Regions:
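Mid-to-C-terminal alpha-helical segments outside catalytic/metal-binding sites
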Residues: 4, 8, 27-33, 42-57, ...
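Bacterial N-terminal signal peptides
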Residues: 10-20
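Sec/Tat signal peptide C-region and signal peptidase I cleavage site
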Residues: 21-25
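Divalent metal-dependent hydrolysis catalytic cores, especially in the metallo-beta-lactamase
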Residues: 29-35, 46-68, 81-86, 107-111
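A cross-domain feature marking catalytic cores of carbohydrate-active enzymes
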Residues: 33-37, 62-63, 85-89, 110-115, ...
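Active-site environment of divalent metal-dependent phosphoester hydrolases
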Residues: 38-41, 65-68, 90-93, 117-118, ...
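Active-site gating/metal-coordination segments in enzymes
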Residues: 65-159
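Catalytic pocket-lining loop regions of alpha/beta-barrel enzymes
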Residues: 108, 123-250
Length: 322
């Protein structure tokens, strides 16, 4: 009887360990670099379940109205959620909001809907602030969605062209910059920014993969991401010491948690159509962002807690590629 009780106790303890401390093993590590916060606990629980099932984490883009919800979610489920703030760059409160996100241990800032072009000097204060605080910067690039209504909105995709990130990457060479949606429809422009900017990455969330699959044109990216890392040794027309072309793409969803699996399937089709080598695929799925955010893919733990000390170099040219 005593032996039976001991065995039962052992089983209960093992179950508790497995349930509360998920083990991530052979399944591919995925880091969703572009996931928007929900506004209730149901979203939290749904995301935890789906992302854990797929050995995935997500960078949660959070406006101030959902700040407390996401801050608690990160504390409760650090193996799933990585905090990113979201600000409107023309809002006078934007610098204060960035400071609050930073102090709370968030790792990045998302910008959307500028009233001027992304590379306008008006926004340089925000960009330099993020660089100094070690915050990843995500910029919406290209076309943006809207609904059918009669409410006037001052918003233009022309102010969010991917080419504007070129100036920001040069202005903030220690920062990590991510363009959302690969600049849809300005894909070639986005690619050329990548070619000369080792600190710039793009996700291909939104309608891009839907469009390319429907048009049977997934191989289009082979034509615009045409260079290789070694070419800089032979020609002055490609960055010397830079990453491989496809390494500039990072996985993201920009959808509800239920959309994760569908996005994984479409991204896999994209990788296969473009014959991306396996080692680079793993970086695109999550290893690149894990390196940037100091995440251990095996445990989902952050190896360098946030907030980072001011002056931290997210992109350190002297260590690049090591």
């Amino acid at each position: 009887m005593q032996i039976l009780k001991v065995r039962t106790l052992i089983l209960v303890v093992l179950f508790a360990i497995i349930f509360y401390f998920p083990v991530y093993s052979a399944q591919r590590f995925i880091l969703d670099s572009h996931h928007h916060a929900g506004d209730n606990q149901e979203w939290v629980q749904k995301a935890v379940k789906i992302y854990r099932e797929n050995n995935a984490m997500c960078c949660v883009l959070t406006y101030m109205e959902d700040f407390e919800l996401v801050k608690k979610a990160i504390k409760d489920y650090p193996d799933v959620f990585i905090g990113y703030g979201a600000v409107r760059p023309d809002d006078p409160q934007a610098p204060r909001q960035i400071e609050e996100f930073y102090k709370a241990g968030f790792s990045g800032i998302k910008y959307h809907s500028p009233q001027k072009n992304w590379d306008d000097e008006k926004y340089y204060q925000l960009y330099r602030m993020c660089e100094y605080l070690g915050l990843v910067m995500i910029f919406h690039t290209g076309v943006t969605s809207r609904s059918i209504n009669d409410m006037p909105v001052y918003q233009s995709m022309m102010r969010m062209r991917p080419g504007y990130l070129d100036a920001i990457a040069r202005l903030c060479p220690r920062a990590i910059i991510q363009g959302a949606h690969f600049g849809n429809p300005w894909y070639e422009e986005a690619a050329e920014v990548c070619r000369w900017s080792p600190n710039v990455f793009f996700d291909i969330t939104g309608s891009t993969l839907h469009k390319l699959i429907k048009l049977n044109d997934l191989t289009r990216f082979q034509k615009i991401l045409w260079w290789s890392a070694g070419e800089g040794q032979q020609t002055v027309h490609t960055l010397k010491g830079g990453p491989e072309a496809f390494e500039h793409i990072v996985f993201g969803t920009d959808e509800e948690p239920e959309g994760l699996v569908g996005n994984i399937e479409r991204f896999q089709l994209f990788l296969e159509a473009n014959k991306v080598p396996e080692a680079i695929r793993e970086k695109m799925w999550g290893l690149t962002m894990a390196r940037i955010l100091d995440i251990d893919p095996a445990t989902h733990k952050c190896t360098r807690p946030r907030p980072l000390p001011p002056g931290t170099k997210l992109f350190d040219a002297s260590r690049f590629g090591k």
